[in-house]
Structure formats: C-alpha cells, structure tokens
Swiss-Prot record:
Its EC number is 2.4.99.28. This is Biosynthetic peptidoglycan transglycosylase. Belongs to the glycosyltransferase 51 family. The chain crosses the membrane at residues 19-39. It is a single-pass membrane protein. It is found in: Cell inner membrane. It comes from Escherichia coli O81 (strain ED1a). It is an enzyme of class 2 (transferase). PANTHER family: BIOSYNTHETIC PEPTIDOGLYCAN TRANSGLYCOSYLASE (PTHR30400:SF0), MONOFUNCTIONAL BIOSYNTHETIC PEPTIDOGLYCAN TRANSGLYCOSYLASE (PTHR30400). Its main location: membrane. Keywords: Cell inner membrane, Cell membrane, Cell shape, Cell wall biogenesis/degradation, Glycosyltransferase, Membrane, Peptidoglycan synthesis, Transferase, Transmembrane, Transmembrane helix.
C-alpha cells in the first residue's frame, strides 16, 4: 500500500473513531438527561420538520406536548403494550422469541417484512436515530436500547415512548393526539379511544385515526381483546406502569 493511501486510511480511521466518541458522549448524555427531564423533540420530529421545509411546506409543524404518566390514561399505556410489545414489563429491551419468528417469516415472505421491535427499541430509534433500514442503524439501536433499559425504569421508557410516538401527520405524543382527534386531554382517553390510537402505530402516515379504515377498526378490536386478556387496568398497577 502506498504512503498516500496509508495517510488517507489513517485519517479516515481517526475521524471515524472521533465521531464514534462524540456520538457516544452525545447519546449517553441524552440518555442520562432524559431519564428525568421532559423530551422537547425527537430525531423523528426533526427529520419530519426538515423534510417538510425542504419540500417547501412551511406550514408543517411537528407538534408535541409533554405529559407525565400521571396525566395519561392507563388505558393508553395498556393499549400500546397490547398492540406493540406484550412482554414489555419482563424483557430487557429485546424480545428474542419475536425476533426469531420475524426472521423466519421474512425468509418465507420477502415482500412482506415483519418487524419485531420492542417498545424500548422503538423509543431508542425514534428519540435518537434517523429513519431507514441498515445494519449500522440496527447496531446503534441495540446499543441505545441497552442504554435506556439500564438507566431508565420501564415506566420512564413507556412515558417517553407515548410522548414522542407519531400518531399522524405532524402529531407527536399522546397529548397532542388526544387533543387533535378527541378534543380532550390524554388523561381522559377511554379504552376504545386508546385502542384506536394504538391501532395506527404501525404506519401513522398511512392509517388515519380521523378516518379509520376497515383494517384499522379490525386492529382496534383485536387490541381491545388483547387488553382484556392482559388483565385490564390492574396489569398496569401490577407492573408499576401507571
């Protein structure tokens, strides 16, 4: 290898190492800070806002109103657990059985990819990472997930998730969603309303809370059944999530 190539390689390696250190400090600081402080915005919110501006849409505002778990109906927490991650109270950030099932499904159905992200993983990637699919992103997501699972309580993870989740175009967080779609605070959401909000989470830009399709209504009904099978509100109290 020539001297010039070695110089370039050495420069790139030093740059990447320094970048990794900076990102580790930034993300580590974020995990520590948001273990107690309200989250003002997420990476997804920033990405959506910048994308809107680049497309000339200056009316778009990624809106979110932070509320504590005490200000969120327990039905809402139960609904997202029933819909997205029923093992949330027990796992350490990853649902290994669901990952294995998703991998087996994706091998058989290459055109219908199934995910297996837990609420902890979704919180990590929505809060800190860019949109997209890559092994690099997955690796960073895994590290961040372990970080928040180590530092945050399960109740804190659920609170952050509910406050940064996307429920529609420009609608982030359960308080903004409750006000937009039901004209009430998140604390007053009913079991049915919570299930409807959770039903659009796989793709909130495609599925609409304001105009639910047959699929969304079917998913809402399924979530309601799962909420009942989990034990209803006592489930949240049992796992200290309310």
């Amino acid at each position: 290898m020539s001297k010039s190539r070695l110089t370039v390689f050495s420069f790139v390696r030093r740059f990447l190492l320094r970048l990794m250190v900076v990102l580790a400090i930034f993300w580590g600081g974020g995990i520590a800070l948001f273990s107690v402080a309200p989250v003002p915005f997420s990476a997804v919110m920033v990405e959506r806002q910048v994308s809107a501006w680049l497309h000339g849409n200056f009316r778009y505002v990624a809106h979110s109103d932070w509320v504590s778990m005490d200000q969120i109906s327990p039905w809402m927490g139960l609904a997202v657990i029933a819909a997205e991650d029923q093992k949330f109270p027990e796992h350490w950030g990853f649902d290994v059985a669901s990952i294995e099932q998703a991998l087996a499904h994706n091998e058989r159905n290459e055109n219908r990819i199934r995910g297996a992200s837990t609420i902890s993983q979704q919180t990590a990637k929505n809060l800190f990472l860019w949109d997209g699919r890559s092994w690099v992103r997955k690796g960073l997501e895994a590290g961040l997930t372990l970080g928040i699972e180590t530092v945050w309580s399960k109740k804190r993870i659920l609170a952050v998730y509910l406050n940064i989740a996307e429920f529609g175009d420009g609608v982030f967080g359960v308080e903004a969603a409750a006000q937009r779609y039901f004209h009430k605070p998140a604390s007053k959401l009913t079991r049915s309303e919570a299930a409807l909000l959770a039903a659009v989470l796989p793709n909130p830009l495609r599925f609409k809370v304001s105009a639910p399709s047959g699929y969304v209504r079917s998913r809402q009904a399924w979530i309601l059944r799962q909420m009942y099978q989990l034990g209803g509100e006592p489930f949240m109290q049992q796992h200290q999530l309310d």
